[in-house]
Amino acid sequence: MNIGIYIYDDAEVLDFSGPFEVFSTAKRLANNDWQVSLIAQTNGPVNARGGFSVNPHYSFADCPELDVFIVVGGDHTHELEKSAVIEWLIHTASTTKRVASVCTGAFLLAKTGLLCKKNVTTHWQDQSDLAAMFKDLTVIANKRWVTDGKFTTSGGISAGIDMSLALVAELINKEHALLTAKQMEYAWL
Protein backbone atom coordinates (compact mmCIF):
# COMPACT_ATOMS: atom_id res chain seq x y z
CA MET A 1 0.00 0.00 0.00
CA ASN A 2 1.36 3.42 -0.97
CA ILE A 3 0.66 6.29 1.43
CA GLY A 4 1.67 9.69 0.11
CA ILE A 5 1.82 12.97 2.01
CA TYR A 6 1.89 16.18 -0.04
CA ILE A 7 4.29 18.84 1.31
CA TYR A 8 5.21 22.33 0.13
CA ASP A 9 7.12 25.42 1.25
CA ASP A 10 5.77 26.76 4.56
CA ALA A 11 3.87 23.54 5.31
CA GLU A 12 3.28 22.99 9.03
CA VAL A 13 5.94 20.50 10.20
CA LEU A 14 3.71 18.44 12.50
CA ASP A 15 1.06 18.26 9.76
CA PHE A 16 3.34 15.95 7.78
CA SER A 17 5.70 14.54 10.41
CA GLY A 18 2.85 13.42 12.70
CA PRO A 19 1.01 11.34 10.05
CA PHE A 20 4.36 10.09 8.68
CA GLU A 21 5.27 8.80 12.14
CA VAL A 22 1.86 7.19 12.67
CA PHE A 23 1.89 5.29 9.37
CA SER A 24 5.59 4.38 9.67
CA THR A 25 5.08 3.05 13.20
CA ALA A 26 1.93 1.16 12.19
CA LYS A 27 3.85 -0.39 9.28
CA ARG A 28 6.74 -1.46 11.50
CA LEU A 29 4.46 -3.00 14.12
CA ALA A 30 2.39 -4.85 11.51
CA ASN A 31 5.44 -5.80 9.44
CA ASN A 32 3.39 -5.00 6.34
CA ASP A 33 4.28 -3.66 2.90
CA TRP A 34 3.16 -0.06 3.40
CA GLN A 35 5.34 2.54 1.72
CA VAL A 36 5.04 5.96 3.37
CA SER A 37 6.42 8.87 1.37
CA LEU A 38 6.57 12.64 1.18
CA ILE A 39 5.68 14.18 -2.18
CA ALA A 40 6.41 17.70 -3.42
CA GLN A 41 5.98 19.48 -6.72
CA THR A 42 9.69 19.05 -7.48
CA ASN A 43 12.49 16.86 -6.14
CA GLY A 44 14.28 19.74 -4.43
CA PRO A 45 14.24 20.48 -0.70
CA VAL A 46 11.04 21.87 0.80
CA ASN A 47 11.37 24.62 3.41
CA ALA A 48 8.58 23.98 5.89
CA ARG A 49 7.55 26.34 8.67
CA GLY A 50 10.28 27.53 10.97
CA GLY A 51 12.95 26.92 8.31
CA PHE A 52 12.67 23.13 8.64
CA SER A 53 14.17 21.71 5.43
CA VAL A 54 12.99 18.32 4.22
CA ASN A 55 13.68 16.31 1.07
CA PRO A 56 10.65 14.69 -0.54
CA HIS A 57 10.80 11.07 -1.64
CA TYR A 58 8.95 11.86 -4.88
CA SER A 59 7.92 14.74 -7.10
CA PHE A 60 4.69 15.05 -9.08
CA ALA A 61 6.56 13.59 -12.07
CA ASP A 62 7.72 10.35 -10.43
CA CYS A 63 5.11 9.77 -7.71
CA PRO A 64 3.76 6.20 -7.67
CA GLU A 65 0.03 5.50 -7.69
CA LEU A 66 -1.31 6.06 -4.17
CA ASP A 67 -3.80 4.18 -2.01
CA VAL A 68 -3.91 6.84 0.73
CA PHE A 69 -3.25 10.52 -0.01
CA ILE A 70 -2.79 13.22 2.64
CA VAL A 71 -2.67 16.97 1.98
CA VAL A 72 -1.12 18.99 4.79
CA GLY A 73 -1.69 22.54 5.94
CA GLY A 74 0.48 25.51 6.65
CA ASP A 75 0.69 28.71 4.67
CA HIS A 76 -1.34 27.33 1.79
CA THR A 77 -2.26 30.60 0.09
CA HIS A 78 0.45 30.38 -2.59
CA GLU A 79 -0.42 26.74 -3.29
CA LEU A 80 -4.04 27.69 -3.98
CA GLU A 81 -2.82 29.92 -6.83
CA LYS A 82 -0.71 27.24 -8.56
CA SER A 83 -2.73 25.62 -11.35
CA ALA A 84 -0.22 22.76 -11.70
CA VAL A 85 -0.65 21.95 -8.00
CA ILE A 86 -4.45 22.04 -8.13
CA GLU A 87 -4.52 19.90 -11.30
CA TRP A 88 -2.19 17.34 -9.69
CA LEU A 89 -4.30 17.32 -6.52
CA ILE A 90 -7.45 16.73 -8.60
CA HIS A 91 -5.86 13.85 -10.49
CA THR A 92 -4.28 12.25 -7.43
CA ALA A 93 -7.31 12.61 -5.14
CA SER A 94 -9.62 11.32 -7.89
CA THR A 95 -7.61 8.13 -8.34
CA THR A 96 -6.88 7.41 -4.67
CA LYS A 97 -9.02 5.18 -2.41
CA ARG A 98 -8.65 7.32 0.75
CA VAL A 99 -7.95 11.04 0.77
CA ALA A 100 -7.26 13.13 3.86
CA SER A 101 -6.17 16.59 4.85
CA VAL A 102 -4.55 17.97 7.96
CA CYS A 103 -5.38 21.46 9.20
CA THR A 104 -5.59 23.99 6.36
CA GLY A 105 -4.86 21.30 3.80
CA ALA A 106 -8.67 21.26 3.60
CA PHE A 107 -8.47 24.54 1.64
CA LEU A 108 -6.37 22.83 -1.03
CA LEU A 109 -8.73 19.86 -1.27
CA ALA A 110 -11.72 22.20 -1.35
CA LYS A 111 -10.13 24.12 -4.24
CA THR A 112 -10.19 20.89 -6.30
CA GLY A 113 -14.00 20.78 -6.07
CA LEU A 114 -13.85 17.20 -4.79
CA LEU A 115 -15.17 18.19 -1.35
CA CYS A 116 -18.33 19.73 -2.79
CA LYS A 117 -21.32 19.04 -0.49
CA LYS A 118 -19.06 17.25 2.03
CA ASN A 119 -18.75 17.61 5.80
CA VAL A 120 -15.24 18.83 6.63
CA THR A 121 -13.16 20.40 9.35
CA THR A 122 -9.94 22.38 9.63
CA HIS A 123 -8.00 24.34 12.25
CA TRP A 124 -10.46 26.14 14.55
CA GLN A 125 -8.99 29.51 13.61
CA ASP A 126 -9.61 28.90 9.88
CA GLN A 127 -13.08 27.34 9.96
CA SER A 128 -14.97 30.55 9.20
CA ASP A 129 -12.61 31.37 6.30
CA LEU A 130 -13.05 27.87 4.84
CA ALA A 131 -16.85 28.18 5.06
CA ALA A 132 -16.75 31.66 3.47
CA MET A 133 -14.44 30.65 0.61
CA PHE A 134 -16.18 27.35 -0.17
CA LYS A 135 -19.88 27.80 0.48
CA ASP A 136 -20.73 24.30 -0.78
CA LEU A 137 -18.97 22.71 2.25
CA THR A 138 -20.42 22.01 5.66
CA VAL A 139 -17.66 22.98 8.09
CA ILE A 140 -17.91 21.06 11.37
CA ALA A 141 -16.50 22.67 14.53
CA ASN A 142 -15.13 20.98 17.65
CA LYS A 143 -14.10 17.72 15.96
CA ARG A 144 -10.55 16.37 15.73
CA TRP A 145 -11.43 14.77 12.39
CA VAL A 146 -14.45 14.34 10.13
CA THR A 147 -15.00 11.57 7.56
CA ASP A 148 -17.40 11.90 4.64
CA GLY A 149 -17.12 9.16 2.05
CA LYS A 150 -13.51 8.57 1.05
CA PHE A 151 -12.47 11.97 2.44
CA THR A 152 -11.26 12.61 5.98
CA THR A 153 -10.29 16.09 7.15
CA SER A 154 -8.71 16.96 10.47
CA GLY A 155 -8.53 19.95 12.73
CA GLY A 156 -5.29 21.77 13.28
CA ILE A 157 -1.77 20.47 13.48
CA SER A 158 -1.74 17.73 16.17
CA ALA A 159 -5.22 16.58 15.12
CA GLY A 160 -3.51 15.03 12.09
CA ILE A 161 -2.05 12.41 14.42
CA ASP A 162 -5.50 11.50 15.72
CA MET A 163 -6.88 11.36 12.18
CA SER A 164 -3.99 9.17 11.02
CA LEU A 165 -4.60 6.76 13.88
CA ALA A 166 -8.27 6.62 12.86
CA LEU A 167 -7.16 5.75 9.32
CA VAL A 168 -4.91 2.99 10.70
CA ALA A 169 -7.95 1.64 12.58
CA GLU A 170 -9.87 1.63 9.31
CA LEU A 171 -7.06 0.14 7.21
CA ILE A 172 -5.96 -2.54 9.71
CA ASN A 173 -8.11 -2.48 12.87
CA LYS A 174 -8.68 -0.45 16.02
CA GLU A 175 -6.42 -2.67 18.12
CA HIS A 176 -3.50 -1.96 15.80
CA ALA A 177 -4.22 1.77 15.95
CA LEU A 178 -4.22 1.60 19.75
CA LEU A 179 -0.94 -0.36 19.68
CA THR A 180 0.55 2.26 17.35
CA ALA A 181 -0.54 5.06 19.69
CA LYS A 182 0.91 3.18 22.67
CA GLN A 183 4.22 2.67 20.86
CA MET A 184 4.31 6.40 20.16
CA GLU A 185 3.31 7.11 23.79
CA TYR A 186 0.41 9.13 22.42
CA ALA A 187 -2.91 9.38 24.26
CA TRP A 188 -5.55 8.53 21.65
CA LEU A 189 -9.27 8.05 22.26
Regions found by a protein language model. Give the residues of each.
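Extended, subdomain-level signal for the structured scaffold at the beginning of enzyme domains
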Residues: M1-V99, A106-K111, K117, M133, ...
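A short glycine-threonine-serine/GTX helix/turn-capping micro-motif
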Residues: K150-G156
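Conserved beta-strand segments that form the floor/walls of ligand-binding pockets within enzyme
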Residues: I70, T121, V146
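Structural detector of well-ordered beta-strand residues that form the stable sheet scaffold
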Residues: V99-A100, T121, I140, T152
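The feature captures the short pre-catalytic strand/loop hairpin that immediately precedes
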Residues: V139-T147
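Divalent-metal (often Zn2+) His-rich catalytic cores of metallo-beta-lactamase-fold enzymes
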Residues: A159
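Short, glycine-/small-residue-rich phosphate/pyrophosphate-handling segment
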Residues: L114-A132
